[in-house]
Amino acid sequence: AAAQTHLSIRRNFLEEAYEACEALDCDDAAMLREELGDVLLQVLFHADIEADRGRMTIDNIADAECRKLIFRHPFLFGGKNASWDELKQQEKGQKTTGEAMQGVARSLPATWRAEKIQKKAAKTGFCWKSAGQALDKLAEEAQELREAVQDDTNIDEELGDLLFAAVRVASTLDKDPEQALHSACEKFIKRFTAMEQSILASGRTLEELSREELLASWDAQKRNGR
């Protein structure tokens, strides 16, 4: 592991974690066993890098995790009743909501990060509480993006605001925005594949059709419930 660095194998860690999640989604025990092993191997790689630096070992990591679990779950280990979030903030030295927001990992998928930040804001009362309010905000942000596109200015900022507002809509509906987007991707792939197969069966290719013909074929698949 000495030839590697945390950054050089960072992508491997992410890929293995996502593959483990894929195994969970598939409810495939054999696949899950393999992928969890791969994740564990990545943990050991990173621990070995730190051991080479003399900063920590896998035993230190396991001990710290046990201590953290005991601290954050006093109702299980000490008979006390306390808020998990409050204990986490106390442990990390976070005194304000802003500090807690800054503590949300930047490496999270953006929809999850936005959701976590919004939930922390919601605990202070700063939020759109109903789906209707959140949808109104989404419409407002959509209009601001439209204006930004017309003016060719601040497009990235307004697009980000629109996506952030969409995450809040999901939260008010108690839905996982990341899962909702994954489902939309799967639906798009399924419908596009059906459209492509239909066009190929007619002896033509997608490239031969006009945009209007492609959209008409897409709408036909949509009406068929695909």
Task: For the regions a language model picked out, list residue spans one by one.
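Flexible "arm" and connector segments at domain edges
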Residues: A2-E35, L41-L159, L163-R226
